[in-house]
Structures are given as structure tokens and as C-alpha cells.
Amino acid sequence: MYIEGVGEVEVIRKRISRMYIHVGRGRHVFVTAPRTCSEDLIRRFLTEKKDWILATLEKTPEAVEYEYTDGEEHILLGKKVTLHVAGGASNACTLNGRDVMITVRSSRTSVRKIYEEWSRDMLRRIVVMYIKKWAETMGVFPGDITIRKMKGRWGSCNVKTGELCFALDLITKDG
């Protein structure tokens, strides 16, 4: 559905009694509405809430699609870093000040994969450091620790197994 001044809004119909507006990643706007709600009523609702939608869109950053090329800027631990990609004898990734040096063995090797594995290892070391500090204080000791890509949360825990799972995106935050 197109709303003047806002743009395209995705309408999701569910078995609910009220309408909800959400601005998601990449500045994607959608409204969840009752199945019985008419298009006209949804359009009026969105028009009434237009100021809120525009204010929220202004605060929401655009989705960043990285290409993992030489000279590209990324966020690492809350600071901008520059990728420097070069060929070499083995796949490696190192941090040198504000520069991330990525060495790729062959052209078929994915720079993204090397960078993500390195980021995952770095985040694991940071998380383990914090867990050691707080586990003793709280008297609770976790089982397994995993790092994975998560869209909707920063982490989770499994009470039965003691597993702690953290979002890979935490590596972009200032710790």
C-alpha cells in the first residue's frame, strides 16, 4: 500500500484486534492489521500516524550492505576501521590500529568469510572475558558459548543446557 509522503507500506493481516506500525531494518515500514480491517481504515490509520512514521524513519539508519572490498569502511567495537585486502600465502585477518588487514590465499576465497570468522573469534574472546568476570560474581557458570548471526536479538540463553548464544553484530558495538 502506498502512503503519500511515507512511501510503500507493507500490510500484514493477522488474527489480532488492533493495528500496529513497525519500522524495521533498512527503513522498511509495515503495519499489522486485523483480518477484518478494510483497506480504507488502514490507509486512514497510516495517514493519522504519518508524523510518527516520518520521525521514526529519520531516526532509523539505512541498512548497510558491505561488499568486503579494499578500502571499505566497517564498524568494529564502535569505531570505524578500513579493510585492506591483499593476496598472500594463507588466509588471515589482523587489526593494526584502525586498519583491518585481510590476506586472501586465492581469488575464490571469500573475504567476507575470513572477516566474519575473525570477528567471531574476537567477539568470543571478549565475551569469555566478561563471562569469567560475571559468572563468579553471580555464582552461575554457563555451559557452551556460541556466536551466530541473529536478526532480532543480541543474544539468548538456554536454561536447561546453560548455553549462551550471542549475536555476531555485537562486534560492531563499543564494549
Regions found by a protein language model. Give the residues of each.
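Active-site-proximal or metal-binding-adjacent scaffold patches in catalytic folds
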Residues: 1-175
